[in-house]
C-alpha cells in the first residue's frame, strides 16, 4: 500500500470515529443522554409525568426506580450548547463546569408518588435560573445545578 493510500485509510478511519455532530462517539453518547434527561423546550409544569415516562427517566439508567428530582431546561439543544461555546463562565472550583451568562426557564419535576417506572407521578415547578453544566469541548454532558440570581 502506498503512502497516499495509507493516508487515505487513516483519514477515513478518523472521519468514521467522529459523529455527525463533530465529536467523538463517547462524547456524543453523553451529550445525547444529557439532552434526553435535561433539555425539552415543550415541557410545562403540567407535563412532568408524561415527559418523564416517555423519556424513561429513572433513578439509574438501567433500573426502574423512580427518580426523586429531575430538572428540564425549557430550550433547545443549540441554545443550551451556547453555555459551552462562549455563553457561559468557567467555574473556578471545577474547570469543566460552566455557568450560563443568561437565565433559562427550567421545570423541576419532583416525585410525589410511586416507586417504580411507569407508576411514577411528578409535580412540576417552573423557575428562572442560571444553569451550571459540565462541558466536554463545546458539548454539555451533565446538568450540575440551577442558580437563582
From Swiss-Prot:
Q: Superkingdom of this entry's organism?
A: Eukaryota
Q: In which tissues is it expressed?
A: Strongly expressed in the adult liver and gut, and weakly in the heart and testis.
The outcome of changing residue 145 to R is: In allele ZF-3d and allele ZF-3e
Result of mutating residue 5 to R?
Answer: In allele ZF-3d and allele ZF-3e
| GO BP, one annotated term | defense response to Gram-negative bacterium
Which residues in this protein are found as Pyrrolidone carboxylic acid? 23
* Annotated positions for site Cleavage: 55
SMART domains found in the cross-reference section:
RNAse_Pc (SM00092)
> Where does it reside?
Secreted
Record-annotated disulphide pairs: 48-109, 66-120, 84-135
- UniProt keywords, alphabetically: Angiogenesis, Antibiotic, Antimicrobial, Developmental protein, Differentiation, Disulfide bond, Endonuclease, Hydrolase, Immunity, Nuclease, Pyrrolidone carboxylic acid, Secreted, Signal
**Could you say which protein family the record assigns here?**
Belongs to the pancreatic ribonuclease family.
Q: Give the CC-aspect GO terms.
A: extracellular region
Identify the coding gene: rnasel3
Add the further remark from the entry.
Although the OmpT protease is absent in Gram-positive bacteria, LF-ZF3 generated by a Gram-negative bacterium can penetrate a Gram-positive bacterium and exert its cytotoxicity.
**What are the GO MF terms of this UniProt record?**
endonuclease activity; RNA binding; RNA nuclease activity
Q: Which residues bind substrate?
A: 67-71
PANTHER family membership: ANGIOGENIN-RELATED (PTHR11437:SF10), RIBONUCLEASE (PTHR11437)
Tell me the SUPFAM superfamilies matching this sequence.
RNase A-like
Residue ranges of coiled coil:
none
Query: Which Gene3D superfamilies does the UniProt entry name for this protein?
Result: Ribonuclease A-like domain (3.10.130.10)
Q: Which residues form the active site?
A: 38 (proton acceptor), 142 (proton donor)
Instruction: Kindly provide the PTM information from the record.
Output: Cleavage between Arg-55 and Arg-56 is catalyzed by a membrane-localized Gram-negative bacterium protease (OmpT in E.coli). The excised fragment is then transported to the bacterium cytosol for cleavage of the disulfide bridge linking Cys-48 and Cys-109, thus separating the N-terminal and LF-ZF3. LF-ZF3 but not the N-terminal peptide possesses bactericidal activity.
Q: EC number(s) per UniProt? A: 3.1.27.-
Signal peptide boundaries? 1-22
- Primary role: Ribonuclease. Angiogenic. Plays a role in host defense. Exhibits strong antibacterial activity against Gram-negative bacteria but mild antibacterial activity against Gram-positive bacteria. The RNase activity is not required for the bactericidal activity.
Protein's name according to its UniProt entry: Ribonuclease-like 3
Amino acid at each position: 500500500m502506498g503512502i497516499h493510500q495509507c493516508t487515505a485509510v487513516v483519514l477515513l478511519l478518523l472521519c468514521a470515529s467522529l459523529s455527525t455532530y463533530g465529536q467523538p462517539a463517547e462524547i456524543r453518547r453523553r451529550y445525547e443522554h444529557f439532552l434526553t434527561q435535561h433539555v425539552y423546550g415543550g415541557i410545562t409544569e403540567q407535563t412532568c409525568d408524561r415527559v418523564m415516562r416517555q423519556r424513561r427517566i429513572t433513578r439509574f439508567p438501567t433500573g426502574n426506580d423512580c427518580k426523586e428530582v429531575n430538572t428540564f431546561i425549557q430550550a433547545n439543544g443549540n441554545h443550551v450548547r451556547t453555555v459551552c461555546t462562549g455563553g457561559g463562565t468557567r467555574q473556578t472550583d471545577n474547570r469543566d463546569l460552566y455557568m450560563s451568562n443568561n437565565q433559562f426557564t427550567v421545570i423541576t419535576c419532583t416525585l410525589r408518588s410511586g416507586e417504580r417506572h411507569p407508576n411514577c407521578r411528578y409535580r412540576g415547578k417552573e423557575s428562572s435560573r442560571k444553569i451550571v453544566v459540565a462541558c466536554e469541548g463545546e458539548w454539555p454532558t451533565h446538568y450540575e445545578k440551577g442558580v437563582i440570581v
